[in-house]
From Swiss-Prot:
This is T-cell surface glycoprotein CD3 zeta chain. It is found in: Cell membrane. It comes from Ovis aries (Sheep). The ITAM domains mediate interaction with SHB. Part of the TCR-CD3 complex present on T-lymphocyte cell surface that plays an essential role in adaptive immune response. When antigen presenting cells (APCs) activate T-cell receptor (TCR), TCR-mediated signals are transmitted across the cell membrane by the CD3 chains CD3D, CD3E, CD3G and CD3Z. All CD3 chains contain immunoreceptor tyrosine-based activation motifs (ITAMs) in their cytoplasmic domain. Upon TCR engagement, these motifs become phosphorylated by Src family protein tyrosine kinases LCK and FYN, resulting in the activation of downstream signaling pathways.
């Protein structure tokens, strides 16, 4: 059905060609030059308007002075600072609501500094587990990688059933 429709459309296109761009004169070089000129003039005008708007904003800024528009009067607080200065008094933490920070024990600190002398001993040699330390499974330990002993025992107790053929 699809092939017959495709063949019919192909035969009709060969007998009655769709009007080409040449019949309308759209490939005439004079028309292309005219359209290029219009596009160039449009680009120059848009660029001039953009530059005028960009550099003339300083003259438009004093249009909303104090007292003219009540919407903008609410925003004028009379000070030049845009942001408040945090932590003017030393020792106060803004994350704790401005309350003074209490001195923490070194054991209560979340992040401890790295001590290279102690770390060098721990990571100088990484040992391998001996055979008696490894847990021996039923021969397919690769399936159970990363499971705890309790979870591994649960999986060992389950019997795998073969999937039915499709």
């Amino acid at each position: 059905m699809k092939w017959t429709a495709l063949v019919i459309v192909a035969v009709l296109q060969t007998q009655f060609p769709v009007t080409a761009a040449q019949s309308f004169g759209l490939l005439d070089p004079k028309l292309c030059y005219l359209l290029d000129g219009i596009l160039f003039i449009y680009g120059v005008i848009v660029t001039a308007l953009f530059l005028r708007a960009k550099f003339s904003r300083s003259a438009d800024a004093p249009a909303y002075q104090h007292g003219q528009n009540p919407v903008y009067n609410e925003l004028n607080v009379g000070r030049r600072e845009e942001y408040a200065v945090l932590d003017r008094r030393g020792g106060f933490d803004p994350e704790m609501g401005g309350k003074p920070q209490r001195k923490k024990n070194p054991h209560e600190v979340v992040y401890n500094e790295l001590r290279k002398d102690k770390m060098a001993e721990a990571y100088s040699e990484i040992g391998m587990k001996s055979d008696n330390q490894r847990r021996r499974g039923k021969g397919h330990d690769g399936v159970y990688q990363g499971l705890s002993t309790a979870t591994k025992d649960t999986y060992d107790a389950l019997h795998m059933q073969a999937l039915p053929p499709r």
